[in-house]
C-alpha cells in the first residue's frame, strides 16, 4: 500500500487545527467564566459597581450589565449571561450549575455552597446545585 504523503499531511494539519481551535475555545471559555464569576460575586454582595466592572470585563457580552443603573437591571443582564455560562461551565472542572426554585433561575458558581445572585442578601442561600 502506497502512502499518500499529501493525504497524511492534510489529516495531520486538520487534526492540529482542531486541537488549536479547541484550546482557543477553552481559553475563551475560561476568560468568560472568570469575568462571569466576578459578576456573580458582586451581585451576591449587592455590589452594583462591582457587577458593572465585571460587565466591562466581559466585553460585548457584558454590555447590558456594564450599563445597568440598578441591581434589578444588573440581575436581569446577569440572567442572560447565565444562560450563556452553563454550556462552557459544563466542560470545566470546579464549576457548578445552581438553581433557585423560588425565582426559577439558574446560574454558575465555583462553590458548592449556594450563593444566589438574584434575590439579594435576603435570598442568598435559596437554591440547590443541579450539576
Give the predicted meaning of each segment:
Residues 1-2, 53:
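Intrinsic low-complexity, intrinsically disordered segments enriched in polar/basic residues
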Residues 14-131:
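Intrinsically disordered, low-complexity terminal tails/loops enriched in metal-binding residues
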Residues 2-10:
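Bacterial N-terminal signal peptides that target proteins for export
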Amino acid at each position: 500500500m502506497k502512502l499518500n504523503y499529501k493525504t497524511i499531511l492534510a489529516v495531520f494539519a486538520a487534526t492540529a487545527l482542531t486541537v488549536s481551535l479547541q484550546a482557543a475555545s477553552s481559553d475563551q471559555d475560561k476568560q468568560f467564566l472568570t469575568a462571569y464569576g466576578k459578576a456573580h460575586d458582586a451581585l451576591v454582595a449587592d455590589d452594583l459597581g462591582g457587577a458593572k466592572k465585571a460587565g466591562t470585563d466581559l466585553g460585548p457580552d457584558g454590555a447590558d450589565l456594564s450599563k445597568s443603573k440598578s441591581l434589578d437591571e444588573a440581575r436581569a443582564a446577569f440572567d442572560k449571561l447565565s444562560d450563556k455560562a452553563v454550556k462552557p461551565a459544563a466542560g470545566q472542572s470546579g464549576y457548578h450549575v445552581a438553581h433557585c426554585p423560588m425565582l426559577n433561575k439558574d446560574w454558575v458558581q465555583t462553590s458548592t455552597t449556594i450563593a444566589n445572585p438574584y434575590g439579594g442578601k435576603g435570598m442568598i442561600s435559596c437554591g440547590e446545585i443541579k450539576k
